């Protein structure tokens, strides 16, 4: 485990910072927030075609760059810093991870290149209880020959109203807790899928409700073993937690930089407030908490690489994700 960026990782981070500083200004974010889709389609295509960020941690055999989660987190940190309005979290940190963790080779071959090209994908698992684990799954399925019939409602689906591809989590009728949970991947133009935008407090992040009514899916859509996907779903959610924590770490750095800059320009009692000891203490506390949180994120990213490659530290993923989540949420 390395405790400093490689030259390549530093270049990726610096390039992301420069690109997003130029393309995701405050004015651009406000414009994207009130647009129909909630993001700038031109910017999204530029991220796909020019920056190739959707492909960062996708293996080369599926058209990706074959890099790791540390590189992904380095980019996500800058996205959080500049409040990028784009379906990146849903497509890359959720749907792509779902395919990498639980997808068959055929599913990866079909859908990962589409995500790299700019198709929007997402994960739907939650209902009204808002829990962040496999027990939150309430949509049910039943077998009908070789097919599966899904019924129920999903809430808080990230970019669900814009998604071209969905990963659905559902539980077998009559099952409880983490038993009987399966994952399915399919396009969103099938009969039986209804979507509606969900008003959110955070307008930089679009969410939706999705209702599935007698949605018929065949065996080719099943990810992993039928009824045994709870462990996969929990792993996917841990990976998404680390990604969100990375965005928070970037946001923290921007808040600190803005605060320090303001303290240098605001004058009181004949001098700038940056010279006041109380302000210095506050800035130092902010920096310390931010560095601790960032360290937790990058440690978790290293563990995520282990988990995605079945390394010796893979079983520490949930703990590392929780530590990053706790530190970043408290500090931010």
Residue ranges of model-derived segments:
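A short core secondary-structure module
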Residues: 151-196
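N-terminal glycine-rich flavin-associated loop
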Residues: 84-106
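Alpha-helical interface subdomain recognition
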Residues: 1-83, 102-107, 114-118, 143-148, ...
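A short, Trp-centered hydrophobic/proline-enriched beta-strand micro-motif
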Residues: 117-127, 168
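Structural signature of FAD isoalloxazine-binding scaffolds in flavoprotein oxidoreductases
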Residues: 66-75, 133-137, 186-187, 216-217
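Cytochrome P450 C-terminal beta-domain/meander region
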Residues: 133-151
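Short beta-strand-to-turn element immediately C-terminal to the catalytic PLP-Schiff-base lysine
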Residues: 101-103, 142, 168-172, 185-187, ...
């Amino acid at each position: 485990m390395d405790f400093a960026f490689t030259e390549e990782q530093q270049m990726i981070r610096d390039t992301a910072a420069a690109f997003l500083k130029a393309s995701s200004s405050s004015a651009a974010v406000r414009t994207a927030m009130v647009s129909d889709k909630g993001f700038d389609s031109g910017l999204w295509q530029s991220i796909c075609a020019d920056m190739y960020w959707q492909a960062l941690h996708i293996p080369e055999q599926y058209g990706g760059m074959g890099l790791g989660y540390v590189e992904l987190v380095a980019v996500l940190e800058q996205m959080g810093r500049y409040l990028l309005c784009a379906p990146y979290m849903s497509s890359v940190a959720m749907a792509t991870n779902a395919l990498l963790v639980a997808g068959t080779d055929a599913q990866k071959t079909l859908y990962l290149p589409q995500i790299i090209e700019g198709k929007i994908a997402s994960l739907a698992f939650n209902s009204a209880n808002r829990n962040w684990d496999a027990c939150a799954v309430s949509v049910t399925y039943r077998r009908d020959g070789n097919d599966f019939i899904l019924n129920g409602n999903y809430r808080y689906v990230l970019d669900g109203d814009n998604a071209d591809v969905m990963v659905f989590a559902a539980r077998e009728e009559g099952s409880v807790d983490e038993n009987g949970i399966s994952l399915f991947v399919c396009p969103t133009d099938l009969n039986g899928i209804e979507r509606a935008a969900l008003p959110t407090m955070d307008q930089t992040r679009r969410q939706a409700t999705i209702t599935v009514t007698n949605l018929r899916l065949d065996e080719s859509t099943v990810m992993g073993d039928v009824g045994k996907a709870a462990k996969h779903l929990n792993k996917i959610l841990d990976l998404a937690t680390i990604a969100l924590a990375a965005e928070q770490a970037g946001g923290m750095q921007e808040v600190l930089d803005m605060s320090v800059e303001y303290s240098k320009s605001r004058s009181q009692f004949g001098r700038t407030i940056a010279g006041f000891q109380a302000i210095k203490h506050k800035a130092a506390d902010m920096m310390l908490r931010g560095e601790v949180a960032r360290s937790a994120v990058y440690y978790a990213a290293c563990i995520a690489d282990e988990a995605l490659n079945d390394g010796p530290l893979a079983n520490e993923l949930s703990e590392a994700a929780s530590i990053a989540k706790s530190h970043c949420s408290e500090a931010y």
